[in-house]
Amino acid sequence: MKINKKTIGGFLLIVFGISVFFGGGSFGFIIPLAIGSLMTYAGIKRFAAGKTITGIIVGGIGAIMLICSLPFVVGIALAAAMVYYGWKLMKNGSADNGVSSFDPEPASAAYQSHFDDEWEEFLKKK
């Protein structure tokens, strides 16, 4: 894999997304999210079946539970998006052929000094 700006950016997005997922989203919010979803679904089914009052009450309580879980859901979605786009950046960044990797380049003639040659000659004279 070639290391360039895209792969580094992708890696940082993945690391940040995983930290948001595990740091910001605890798994304790999954239970109210599931219960709220089931209650909202049951309320809609009751409302459609003609039981208007119980459908509104059950659906309303479920919606309130879902709204309270909304920051958790948004955080998880944001973390998943960061991991996905980070991975995509890393994969696309490593496919670039125009970017050189971190292979050492040979020194050009302008930067080569003849100090070693002169030092060897100096030592031979002594």
Curated annotation (Swiss-Prot):
<dbReference type="GO" id="GO:0005886">
    <property type="term" value="C:plasma membrane"/>
</dbReference>
<protein>
    <recommendedName>
        <fullName>Protein LiaI</fullName>
    </recommendedName>
</protein>
<keyword id="KW-0472">Membrane</keyword>
<keyword id="KW-0812">Transmembrane</keyword>
<keyword id="KW-1133">Transmembrane helix</keyword>
<feature type="transmembrane region" description="Helical">
    <location>
        <begin position="56"/>
        <end position="76"/>
    </location>
</feature>
<keyword id="KW-1003">Cell membrane</keyword>
<feature type="transmembrane region" description="Helical">
    <location>
        <begin position="11"/>
        <end position="31"/>
    </location>
</feature>
